[in-house]
Amino acid sequence: MIAAVHGPAIGGGLGLALAADFRVTCAEARFSANFNRLGIHPGFGLSYMLPRLVGQQQASLLFYTGRRIAGEEAVRIGLADQLVPQPEVRSKAIELAEEIAASSPVAVQSTRSTLRAGLVEQFRLAVARESIEQNIHFETEDFQEGVRAMSERRMPRFKGY
């Protein structure tokens, strides 16, 4: 699966993009794991997928700060695979799919299975943990403040509970 990211991939949208095998993007795209800015634990399997792609240090930085990064930085840190002009994102993603399709389907499928061995189980464990943590966070004042602050387009004033 190939994701063509030409706009925002934020929160759950980032999780969807990371579920793909490859990501084609542009300078105008924005990526953010902004959960902590909302006062909540990351979800959508991001606590497993993001460190797997960019490393523990970069993932921690993106989670803790909620920082938005552009397409260039996403490619630089390994979050995306190709940087192309915005009007070409979709066509370049299709070109990549066609390039992969020129290989043996049996070989591609078995290689993908080998590369992803154990991924499903680890992903399920991460999602289960995320769900437990999020259910706790939904009840906090910090989560309510984070959502309120985002809707009011202001910095949140978290209390730590």
Question: What are these language model-derived features?
Answer:
Residues V24-A29, G71, A80-A128, N135-E141, ...:
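C-terminal long alpha-helix characteristic of the crotonase
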Residues Q144-A149, F158:
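Anionic, Ser/Thr-rich low-complexity intrinsically disordered regions
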Residues L46-M49, Q58, A70, S110, ...:
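Hydrophobic alpha-helical segments typical of transmembrane helices
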Residues R67-E73:
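Acidic, divalent-metal-coordinating active-site segment for phosphoryl/phosphodiester hydrolysis
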Residues L62-F63, T111-T114, M150:
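Short alpha-helical scaffolding segments that buttress acidic/His motifs in well-ordered protein cores
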Residues A4, I10-Y64, I77, K92-L96:
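CoA-thioester-processing core
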